[in-house]
Structures are given as structure tokens and as C-alpha cells.
């Protein structure tokens, strides 16, 4: 198996990407095609004593910056690491693509270069979000700001396949993010989506879920448009950061707090581990014909390594093939 990795993507590239890639090669036994500035990658590897065993480098002369307009960048920067990597994936030179680069460019590239599964207009960005009972899959979390009901039905089908195949959960539950639990709640689009999801084959739709209940982790998949999903994701990240910061201040405030921290150290460590997004890897663009994984822009080595692990699981379990079969069933049911 070969995983294509963007060596230039993210705030900590290429060092963190190199470290995470080398760890993944060693731990997971994958082969990697690293796309980026070969000179810079080799120099960084030499300076930090990072082995390049199992990593084939493909030189790129351009980089897509976060400030670049996504569609224009994909069309004009043909020698960028993202475009080169996605083309290698399309040509069958690798089995999946991992990048911590521009989300917008990856979304456009996944649509225009890799192309989408039949029945999918545009790929949905999905991510596992830490929660109280168990992490849940949130999609769309930023790629498609406006969605039609049929798109949300496709998201539900693909999300169920992902949680089943990658997370190993049988018969995952699906909920629609809304401002109330009743069927009558929400905009006309959400009310129509609710009825469509009730009739969608192959998923366990449990109805609407209110934002206050999402962090409990009572469902496996939360479906919404990209605007709503991005707000949920960023609010969750902000609240988690605030609470951990408040705990730290409380423990360091006085001697009693420091003693309490020593007694609760293992529990606090478990909480931080549970809330660490890097443990879950990256965010897949569900609906692309082949696995495209977006690692967090601030990913360190652990995040990159886990994103590669995630890509490996997607390939091993034929995620894209499974999603296409489920989408075909959805299309047939909608035509009846």
C-alpha cells in the first residue's frame, strides 16, 4: 500500500510531516510517496536525523498558500504539492492522499482532479469530534456551506459507512442537527431533509439532535450543512480549550490546588487524551473517488501519523467502494 503525503502542508511543515510520516512507515508498514520540495525535505531529514526509509520523494516547485484562492490555485499551480499529489492519486500511483494544507484547495482538488463518486455533487468534509460518551462523526464541517436535502441524505449514508468501516461501529446511529428535536422544527430545507432521512435505506436515523445534546456523544453521526458544522466544530474546540485552561488555573492557584492536581493527575491526563483531536487523525473528504484526508493545519507528528493510519484503514476496508454501493441504493430508492 502506498500513501501519498503532502510534505509542504500545514503550519509545522516539513518537519512535523516528516516525523509523523517516518513514524507511520515504521509502525504501520506503509510505503509513502512524499510530494514537496525534495531539497528542503532532504535537508530537514538530515538536520533532524529522520530516516527516509520507505519514503519516495517527488519534487514539487510550488506550494499552495492558505491565502490563495482555492479554485485559481488548483488550476494555476500545477507543480504544487497538493495538485501533484492528487494527480498521482488519480493516476493510481498511490492509494490515498494526506495533506495538512489548504482545506479549500483540497476540496476543489478532490472534486476536479480525483472526482466524486456517482451520486455525489461535492465531497463533504467529515471529522471525528471528541464527546462525553464517545466521539461522533460530524459532516459537513465546512466544505459545503449551503446544502440541499438530497446532499444531507448522501452525507448520512457516507457517514454511516465511514463510522462502520473505519471506526468499527456496527449499525451506527445518525441524527440531523437542528434547533429542536421535533420533526416540525427548523427551516423548510431541514424539515424536508428530516423526511428524506427517515426514508433513506441503510441508515439508523434517530431524528433531530439539538446543539446542547451533541457534546454528549449519544449518536455516531451528526449531519448538517457546512456552515452549521463549522460553527459546531469551532465552538466545541473553543469550549474545550477554555475548560482545560480554567482547570489549569484552578490547580495552580494555590497549594491546595497543586495537591489536588497530584491526586487527580491521571484523570486529567485521560481527559486531555480524550479531547485531543490529533488522536483521531484527519478529516476525510467523503464522496471523493479515492481517500483524501485533511490533517489539521497545526498538526504535529502525532496528528500526521494518525492521519496516515486513518488513510490506511480507509484503503484496507474499501471505504470508497462501500460508499458507492450504499449511494447506488440511495439513488434507486429516491427514483422509486
Positions of the model-derived regions?
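Phosphate/nucleotide-donor binding subsite
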Residues: 49-94
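Glycine-rich phosphate/diphosphate-binding loop of Rossmann-like nucleotide-binding domains
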Residues: 15-16, 31-33, 39, 145-207, ...
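Short glycine/serine/threonine-rich phosphate/pyrophosphate-binding segments
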Residues: 13-17, 79-92, 96-110, 117, ...
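Short, glycine-rich nucleotide/cofactor-binding loops
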Residues: 5-14, 143-153, 294-301
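Glycine-rich phosphate/nucleotide-binding loop
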Residues: 111-124, 128-138, 218-222, 226-335
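Short helix-capping segments at alpha-helix termini
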Residues: 25-28, 46-54, 167, 197-203
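N-terminal phosphate-binding or glycine-rich loops at protein starts, especially the Walker A/P-loop
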Residues: 1-42
Amino acid at each position: 500500500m502506498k500513501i501519498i503525503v503532502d510534505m509542504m502542508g500545514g503550519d509545522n511543515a516539513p518537519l512535523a510531516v516528516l516525523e509523523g510520516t517516518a513514524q507511520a512507515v515504521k509502525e504501520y508498514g506503509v510505503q509513502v510517496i512524499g510530494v514537496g520540495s525534495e531539497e528542503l525535505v532532504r535537508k530537514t531529514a538530515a538536520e533532524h536525523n529522520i530516516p527516509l526509509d520507505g519514503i519516495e520523494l517527488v519534487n514539487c516547485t510550488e506550494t499552495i498558500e492558505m491565502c490563495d484562492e482555492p479554485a485559481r490555485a488548483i488550476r494555476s499551480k500545477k507543480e504544487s504539492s497538493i495538485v501533484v499529489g492528487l494527480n498521482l492519486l488519480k493516476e493510481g500511483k498511490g492509494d490515498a492522499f494526506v495533506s495538512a494544507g489548504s482545506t479549500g484547495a483540497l476540496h476543489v482538488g478532490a472534486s476536479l482532479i480525483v472526482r466524486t463518486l456517482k451520486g455525489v455533487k461535492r465531497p463533504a468534509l467529515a471529522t471525528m469530534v471528541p464527546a462525553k460518551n464517545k466521539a461522533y462523526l460530524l459532516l459537513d464541517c465546512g466544505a459545503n456551506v449551503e446544502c440541499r436535502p438530497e446532499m444531507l441524505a448522501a452525507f448520512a449514508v457516507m457517514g454511516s459507512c465511514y463510522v462502520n468501516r473505519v471506526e468499527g461501529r456496527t449499525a451506527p446511529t445518525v441524527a440531523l442537527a437542528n434547533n429542536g428535536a421535533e420533526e416540525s422544527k427548523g427551516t423548510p430545507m431541514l424539515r424536508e431533509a428530516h423526511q428524506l432521512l427517515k426514508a433513506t435505506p441503510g441508515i439508523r436515523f434517530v431524528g433531530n439532535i439539538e446543539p446542547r445534546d451533541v457534546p454528549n456523544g449519544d449518536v455516531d453521526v451528526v449531519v448538517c450543512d457546512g456552515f452549521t458544522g463549522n460553527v459546531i466544530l469551532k465552538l466545541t474546540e473553543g469550549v474545550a480549550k477554555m475548560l482545560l485552561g480554567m482547570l489549569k488555573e484552578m490547580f495552580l492557584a494555590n497549594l491546595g490546588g497543586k495537591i489536588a492536581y497530584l491526586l487527580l493527575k491521571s484523570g486529567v491526563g485521560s481527559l486531555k487524551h480524550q479531547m485531543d483531536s490529533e488522536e483521531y487523525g484527519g478529516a476525510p473528504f467523503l464522496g471523493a473517488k479515492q481517500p483524501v484526508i485533511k490533517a489539521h493545519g497545526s498538526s504535529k507528528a502525532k496528528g500526521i501519523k494518525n492521519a496516515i493510519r486513518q488513510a490506511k484503514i480507509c484503503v484496507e476496508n474499501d471505504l470508497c467502494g462501500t460508499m458507492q454501493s450504499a449511494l447506488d441504493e440511495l439513488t434507486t430508492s429516491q427514483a422509486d
